């Protein structure tokens, strides 16, 4: 049989034209080792830093180390079922978490999955956990207060909306208590709160949630929990996830407050991940970019301008500035604030509140050291009445601490020094405050006014707090109109000052304390 070359070529052409070939291009690699949640992958190309990788069993990881012939990734969640030789695929996506008002009142993990047993979150939107902070041009100066309800903070270390104020101290000296009081005091103040628990015992986190529910604070609070039993990856990601949830409100012209409790544990988790990824260790075995770990997080807390909000919402929200206020917590070891992470975070934040174990053990709670605590920008946000009355308190306290040290060695003191010491003792007593009992602005103003004008000087030190409480109760029942004026105007006019003076003198004469 004779084959015609032209027929053969025609046949081949027709076959080629009728061929249906589908090309499915997928970028995939192979697991070569798994160690403590860190996976090394060979064969992945075109993978991005921070990209999500898909492992078998619907498990995801995060690409962190991009090397010449391998990729180092951290697993998000359980990794026991992953073994050598498993196929890993790129997703082309970066890690996102759910955001929106649906999260308020819920307890979620670092990936936004609910862990409170109240069903799915049903958030309509998601957002990237790593975002660039707003530029200088989009920011506004801090000018509105965040009232914590804690006398010593609101009077001496005021916090403004959009500020970053560090809470620093040893373990068990009241750092979380200060943060929780700040959340509880936001009831009815149109401020969404986010509490990020990092590396704490699950039972401690549960106690926090229970206390927030008891005080009605969960109605405006989101809790992001990465407990000590969670992986290092979850503890590393939790603050960024919480920050993204807070930015949703900031960028839409609302105010939010976020508490990171605490960033020391996040730094430990990041150190663990970095060492397992074989990154070169530096001071205290932390990797070289541990400063950037916290700076890129805390720079996202800001007060943004009306123009920023309008641009972000495509003109839907006009004339409103948003804010995200951050209260990072750092745990020191034996009061050493010169360690690597504490000094880093002190330099990033706009001030710090130092809590001291010695003061805590002496019964001065909250155990705030007024001498070294400072707020660099909060003074501009203080309410008029508190600003007017708080200057004398700080001076009295600072002079008292200085004189008290000298008085230990001096046998006979002159009258002026003795008076200064006596007033200092009473001011120190006045600034004591039980947990979960934050004060309103007018209550703080009344206490400061009484201290500044010598109404506490002739009282016994043990009577100071009972006098203060009795005075507040008396004003509530007999001078409600005066309270309302102070609360509404956030100022103390000449007439109101006269009325307040008369009310205090009348109460003091009655001796009902």
UniProtKB/Swiss-Prot annotation:
InterPro entries: ATP_synth_asu-like_sf, ATP_synth_asu_C, ATP_synth_asu_C_sf, ATP_synth_F1_a_nt-bd_dom, ATP_synth_F1_asu, ATPase_a/bsu_AS, ATPase_F1/V1/A1_a/bsu_N, ATPase_F1/V1/A1_a/bsu_N_sf. GO terms for molecular function: ADP binding; ATP binding; proton-transporting ATP synthase activity, rotational mechanism. It is a peripheral membrane protein. GO terms for cellular component: plasma membrane; proton-transporting ATP synthase complex. The record marks 373 as: Required for activity. Produces ATP from ADP in the presence of a proton gradient across the membrane. The alpha chain is a regulatory subunit. This is ATP synthase subunit alpha.
């Amino acid at each position: 049989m004779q084959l015609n070359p032209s027929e053969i070529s025609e046949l081949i052409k027709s076959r080629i034209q009728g061929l249906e070939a589908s090309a499915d291009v997928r970028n995939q690699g192979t697991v070569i080792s798994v160690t403590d949640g860190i996976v090394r992958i060979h064969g992945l190309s075109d993978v991005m830093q921070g990209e999500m990788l898909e492992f078998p069993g619907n498990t995801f990881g995060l690409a962190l180390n991009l090397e010449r012939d391998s990729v180092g990734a951290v697993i998000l969640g359980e990794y026991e079922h992953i073994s050598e030789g498993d196929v890993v695929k790129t997703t082309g996506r970066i890690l996102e978490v759910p955001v929106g008002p649906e999260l308020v009142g819920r307890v979620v993990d670092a990936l936004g999955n609910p862990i409170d047993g109240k069903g799915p979150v049903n958030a309509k939107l998601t957002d990237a956990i790593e975002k660039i902070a707003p530029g200088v041009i989009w920011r506004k100066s801090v000018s509105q207060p965040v009232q914590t309800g804690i006398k010593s903070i609101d009077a001496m270390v005021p916090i403004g909306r959009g500020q970053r104020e560090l809470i620093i101290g040893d373990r068990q000296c009241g750092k979380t208590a200060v943060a929780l009081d700040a959340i509880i005091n936001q009831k009815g103040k149109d401020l969404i709160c986010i509490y990020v628990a990092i590396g704490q015992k699950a039972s401690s986190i549960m106690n926090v949630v229970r206390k927030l529910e008891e005080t009605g604070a969960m109605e405006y609070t989101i809790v992001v929990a990465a407990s000590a039993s969670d992986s290092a990856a979850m503890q590393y990601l939790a603050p960024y996830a919480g920050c993204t949830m807070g930015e949703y409100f900031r960028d839409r012209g609302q105010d939010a407050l976020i508490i990171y409790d605490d960033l020391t544990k996040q730094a430990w988790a990041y150190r663990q991940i970095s060492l397992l990824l074989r990154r070169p260790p530096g001071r205290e075995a932390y990797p070289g970019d541990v400063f950037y770990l916290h700076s890129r997080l805390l720079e996202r807390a800001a007060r943004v301008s009306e123009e920023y909000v309008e641009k972000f919402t495509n003109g839907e929200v006009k004339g409103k500035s948003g804010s995200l206020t951050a209260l990072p917590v750092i745990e020191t070891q034996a009061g050493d604030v010169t360690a690597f992470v504490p000094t880093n975070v002190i330099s990033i934040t706009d001030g710090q509140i130092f809590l001291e174990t010695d003061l805590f053990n002496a019964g001065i709670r909250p155990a705030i050291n007024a001498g070294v605590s400072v707020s660099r920008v909060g003074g501009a946000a203080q309410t008029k009445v508190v600003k007017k009355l708080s200057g004398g308190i700080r001076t009295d306290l600072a002079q008292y601490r200085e004189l008290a040290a000298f008085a230990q060695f001096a046998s006979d003191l002159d009258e002026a020094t003795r008076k200064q010491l006596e007033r200092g003792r009473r001011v120190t007593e006045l600034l004591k405050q039980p947990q979960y009992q934050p004060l309103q602005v007018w209550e703080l103003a009344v206490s400061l006014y009484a201290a500044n004008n010598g109404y506490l000087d002739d009282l016994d030190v043990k009577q100071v707090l009972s006098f203060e409480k009795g005075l507040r109760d008396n004003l509530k029942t007999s001078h409600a109109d005066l309270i309302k004026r102070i609360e509404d105007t956030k100022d103390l006019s000449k007439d109101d000052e006269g009325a307040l003076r008369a009310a205090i003198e009348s109460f003091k004469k009655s001796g009902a304390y």
